Amino acid sequence: MEDAGAAGPGPEPEPEPEPEPEPAPEPEPEPKPGAGTSEAFSRLWTDVMGILDGSLGNIDDLAQQYADYYNTCFSDVCERMEELRKRRVSQDLEVEKPDASPTSLQLRSQIEESLGFCSAVSTPEVERKNPLHKSNSEDSSVGKGDWKKKNKYFWQNFRKNQKGIMRQTSKGEDVGYVASEITMSDEERIQLMMMVKEKMITIEEALARLKEYEAQHRQSAALDPADWPDGSYPTFDGSSNCNSREQSDDETEESVKFKRLHKLVNSTRRVRKKLIRVEEMKKPSTEGGEEHVFENSPVLDERSALYSGVHKKPLFFDGSPEKPPEDDSDSLTTSPSSSSLDTWGAGRKLVKTFSKGESRGLIKPPKKMGTFFSYPEEEKAQKVSRSLTEGEMKKGLGSLSHGRTCSFGGFDLTNRSLHVGSNNSDPMGKEGDFVYKEVIKSPTASRISLGKKVKSVKETMRKRMSKKYSSSVSEQDSGLDGMPGSPPPSQPDPEHLDKPKLKAGGSVESLRSSLSGQSSMSGQTVSTTDSSTSNRESVKSEDGDDEEPPYRGPFCGRARVHTDFTPSPYDTDSLKLKKGDIIDIISKPPMGTWMGLLNNKVGTFKFIYVDVLSEDEEKPKRPTRRRRKGRPPQPKSVEDLLDRINLKEHMPTFLFNGYEDLDTFKLLEEEDLDELNIRDPEHRAVLLTAVELLQEYDSNSDQSGSQEKLLVDSQGLSGCSPRDSGCYESSENLENGKTRKASLLSAKSSTEPSLKSFSRNQLGNYPTLPLMKSGDALKQGQEEGRLGGGLAPDTSKSCDPPGVTGLNKNRRSLPVSICRSCETLEGPQTVDTWPRSHSLDDLQVEPGAEQDVPTEVTEPPPQIVPEVPQKTTASSTKAQPLEQDSAVDNALLLTQSKRFSEPQKLTTKKLEGSIAASGRGLSPPQCLPRNYDAQPPGAKHGLARTPLEGHRKGHEFEGTHHPLGTKEGVDAEQRMQPKIPSQPPPVPAKKSRERLANGLHPVPMGPSGALPSPDAPCLPVKRGSPASPTSPSDCPPALAPRPLSGQAPGSPPSTRPPPWLSELPENTSLQEHGVKLGPALTRKVSCARGVDLETLTENKLHAEGIDLTEEPYSDKHGRCGIPEALVQRYAEDLDQPERDVAANMDQIRVKQLRKQHRMAIPSGGLTEICRKPVSPGCISSVSDWLISIGLPMYAGTLSTAGFSTLSQVPSLSHTCLQEAGITEERHIRKLLSAARLFKLPPGPEAM
């Protein structure tokens, strides 16, 4: 269609005549195919002509139009058209004979090359038709035909070397290449290679082009032979030689004309007109030639048919399978136009336009012909064809004027270059050449009827081009710039095939820019660096970056639009801005027109319409999200942080002592607080917790809870208890949002000022439990702290702060709070330790040792503290005596109950009473009260011990707790707990652990130390039930024994608190229990248990020398491969549910990997964590076997004892294991049972 438009404008007519010369080369390469092609082409021509004739009128009309257009005599135009037609016929004949007359072919190709389009000009219409045909088959009837004609030239050169092959191909392609052999000539191949080299087309495209040409040529050859029988080819052959020379002259003329044309083309409009004039001048001869061809042979008949507008189509269809598509387009063309020549001219013009249009989608209305032709071909080789067609046409025009493509067969090279972008660049190049030539020629005949249409098209196109020229040309020019002027547009067209929009908008424009650009660029292979690129550019401009929707490169910032801006419809590069849009800035040129990505479109925008977002402003998104989850944004300054934790009174102290920024502040340690004379234990705990959270946030800024933990923790700390609110599950609580509610509930329920302050802070982000805990814990903690005099300072810290901390912790992350509590506890006296006893560790450890225990106390808080307590528990367990453990247990229970919820506070207190009564006598019973189901120490203990029981108890404990306290307490606790994620968040667990280590647990300790300790135990009871499974020591044994057991089991993990203690806080069972409990309780429990359990697990792993960051526990990608046997053993040793142990082990593993800056892929769930059981086939050593059964710490022991090979494993005995130094009965049993089982697989593996 564009061709038509282009032809109409004027440049096209010239190109059309020029295409005629190409036919000559076409004959050169493939005389017979030329004949067959001629016939096929004549059919195509007929179709085209029919279309053109039908819609555009007859040849006479076209000639008249040309005459009018060129201000020349009608008879001259007719003569010229006749000449062209004759030439074309002779060329067709020659095409048949060119094989026979290489000289003429060479001459033609040389002339064509020299003229660029000469060949096309002199080429008879038949040849034009052939190219058209090819074009159709490839690109579209007309578009491809034209460009094929151009290409034909090129191809002819190629075909010279590969005539036979080319012929076959030619037949398939029919005209553009039919003239030459199906195989490309060397020149054509060179062109293709050049195109590939210049990245105009890919190698694949070039190969595809070759194949397509061959296939089409073969078909065409088949057709041609059929045609030859008609005699059309022989006739052509006869006149072919003469025509060949004639063509040479004509080509020379045309080349001159085309050069002029090219210059004109450079000025798009003038070029067009001149092209048309040239076309007219050439066309008359072309038409004459074509008529001759028709007369001469059936091909002529076909041509006549073309003129008639019907005959050719059938032939075409019959002629070549590939042509049918062309035919379809042809038939479309044919029916509209009665004058085949006119049609052809129109077609050519259209082809030209069409090449563009075709490439783009044949949608341009002005290029109706092009569209018709284009569709069939378009489908076939829309991309290549179009790019070639358009590019080639443009190039052809440029080439003709430049004669630059001469080297490669006239247009072919240029076209090819242009079409390099397209897959079949050579064919396209030829076709493009043909298109141009045809356009040039056809305008002559086609000008008559086409003339009017062409004129209108021209005018329309001109207007469009002039309008769009700025935008489209700029786009296309950008394309042209990217590619040599015209080629880019042509290629864009191909690419735009799918985007008719661009084509329509820029088809003529493209032609023009192509022509103008091509005139200068045409010679340049139009390396068109990549028409595709330019296409893309233009497409982008026009279609809004369809090509590269999302820009994936680096951005140099972001900007928020503050003023709406709607760009001009002609400004395709500018982004449409709406207030509030966020633009990702790609570049900020100093001129002020920045480039950015908005709504998946890359474009430009003026910096004055936007406000650049600073990094901080951009980050709010995350914090906002977190806030939505109930997490406050990270504090931005020390002042902000102190304000959040309600300790602004210390601001001057920090600022005057060099703590001006958070980076310095997060290095704050307890000794520094002493130096700064900050003595208030609560304040110290809060500050240390805030520091921990800051550090955590930095190391783990992305882990959901850290930031919030910091804020919440800080807030909670400022509120009430320092760090004890280890209940907070940063990740889970935040995630579920239940935590928030829980904290709110707690805040509501807690009436204590400290609790209120804490809850106030906590409400926002922490679970209720922490709040309640903090209230209760504060009250109880204060009381208990008083009770534990020595502990008092720290205890109050531990106690009150624990409550607060717990809350904070729940909000932020239990571990931090707990850790601080532990640290604080460490500082605090025994009593302090006791409150921490909340944690299993605390319970186990003596009051003095209980410093850590408090951490455990914190841990008991189901929410998050549990995890921390576990850690604390580990350390405190060692330290604390069983007695203390029981006391701690009570304290823990108390603390936990407080933490669980303020409503629970009452409950906790009641529980405390009962637990204190029974629990004081027996710590285990207190744990049981946790379970509530079994208030009796024994019963409670048992419950705590069983993981399932623990879970049930956890639930029950919640219920129990509340029953002990009040329904309100229960409800509150349940509410709070549901708010807390049922499972402890992995991060929180880690954090808990760390916090425990830091001594965050002190909070619970204070409360547990005092009578309220029963209260604390209540909470611990909850936790205890879950806890009991957590710690191996938390065996269902007697309550009294439990502490011992706890210590004993604790001993292995050294940090493990006494059994009952473990049960209470440490018990992952709490976690487990938390899971089973309500969502809220589960979460709380899981948090508390998680903290405890994580600490216990980590300490146990450390004691056993198991490095989870190494194989087989973690592979090089950070995936988990913890053997199930190890998880099972730890679950037994820690008396915790396997699920919790597995989750904690994975958290530990991930944390350790991250500390090593290694990739860490957390695994989800027990099955995934243990999904890599060591298969017997993988066991190659005793060490591997021990790892597979979860007892890797005995590798050295067994090796020392002489068991160094797998063959010795089956012979292991109880005695030899004891002699080797393995004293743990369960481990010995495991080893023996595994050794017995190993007898089967070991055979091969035994070493």
Swiss-Prot record:
InterPro entries: SAM, SAM-SH3_domain_protein, SAM/pointed_sf, SASH1_SAM_repeat1, SASH1_SAM_repeat2, SASH1_SH3, SH3-like_dom_sf, SH3_domain. The modification Phosphoserine is found at S90, S248, S407, S614, S821, S839. Keywords: Cytoplasm, Disease variant, Hypotrichosis, Palmoplantar keratoderma, Phosphoprotein, Repeat, SH3 domain, Tumor suppressor. Residues 1-39, 126-145, 221-257, 316-344, 449-573, 616-639, 713-810, 846-884, 903-946, 971-1065 are annotated as: Disordered. Residues 13-28 have a biased composition (Acidic residues). The modification Phosphothreonine is found at T858. Changing S513R: In DUH1; uncertain significance. Its main location: cytoplasm. Residues 524-536, 746-765 have a biased composition (Polar residues). Residues 852-860 are annotated as: Required for interaction with TRAF6. SMART domains: SAM, SH3. One of its GO terms (molecular function) is G-protein alpha-subunit binding. It holds the Pfam family SAM_2. Disulfide bonds: none annotated. Residues 633-697, 1177-1241 form the SAM domain. Residues 622-631 have a biased composition (Basic residues). It is found in: Cytoplasm. Residues 331-343, 468-484, 505-523 have a biased composition (Low complexity). SUPFAM superfamilies: SAM/Pointed domain, SH3-domain. GO terms for cellular component: cytoplasm; cytosol; nucleoplasm; protein-containing complex. The keyword Repeat applies. Interacts with GNAS. Interacts with IQGAP1. Interacts with TRAF6 (via C-terminus); the interaction is LPS-dependent. Interacts with MAP3K7, CHUK and IKBKB. It is linked to Dyschromatosis universalis hereditaria 1: A form of dyschromatosis universalis, an autosomal dominant pigmentary genodermatosis characterized by a mixture of hyperpigmented and hypopigmented macules distributed randomly over the body, that appear in infancy or early childhood. The trunk and extremities are the dominant sites of abnormal pigmentation. Facial lesions can be seen in 50% of affected individuals, but involvement of palms and soles is unusual. Abnormalities of hair and nails have also been reported. This is SAM and SH3 domain-containing protein 1. It comes from Homo sapiens.
